[in-house]
């Protein structure tokens, strides 16, 4: 085996480790990592201590429209879009770094992540397939995940017009307020126009 192929394999293993630690499913690993299915399964078991979960990947855009899911999804995708514009790295590494940044922001708010890595990856695919879009709220000017081809005029986000049930469950209101603080215009700009000095973009 040549030196180049050895180093290439090391990079693929490092990539697989990063993805598995973030919660990537086997289907995603097979599509993004240049290792055999058998090696990926062995690596997954070694890191997680269990076999990879079975089942289909999420296929509906509707989940991203629900209250807290939309807040978290919008937070992540704005970060991803910013990183994609300002980085020349491979797409998979932009995805990894954006998701880590999302987790850091959620931890800073003393909250729990709603968006897992699989749904984050699937959402990026939905955007690439023109199934989702970012719509600008006419009240706060934040950019939020919405169905593609929905009317953008007069769009009001889930923070400015939360559902009536929002906050009724114990702890939900506190969590939403934390997310709102992280997502607000005064916090991180909530868009690709955000200044590099905004939250997390140092």
UniProtKB/Swiss-Prot annotation:
The keyword Transcription regulation applies. GO terms for cellular component: cytoplasm. It holds the Pfam family FlhC. It is found in: Cytoplasm. Zn(2+) binds at residues 137, 140, 157, 160. Binds 1 zinc ion per subunit. Its main location: cytoplasm. Transmembrane segments: none annotated. Its cofactor is Zn(2+). GO terms for molecular function: DNA binding; zinc ion binding. Belongs to the FlhC family. Functions in complex with FlhD as a master transcriptional regulator that regulates transcription of several flagellar and non-flagellar operons by binding to their promoter region. Activates expression of class 2 flagellar genes, including fliA, which is a flagellum-specific sigma factor that turns on the class 3 genes. Also regulates genes whose products function in a variety of physiological pathways. Heterohexamer composed of two FlhC and four FlhD subunits. Each FlhC binds a FlhD dimer, forming a heterotrimer, and a hexamer assembles by dimerization of two heterotrimers. NCBIfam families: PRK12722.1. This is Flagellar transcriptional regulator FlhC. The lineage of its organism: Bacteria, Pseudomonadati, Pseudomonadota, Betaproteobacteria, Burkholderiales.
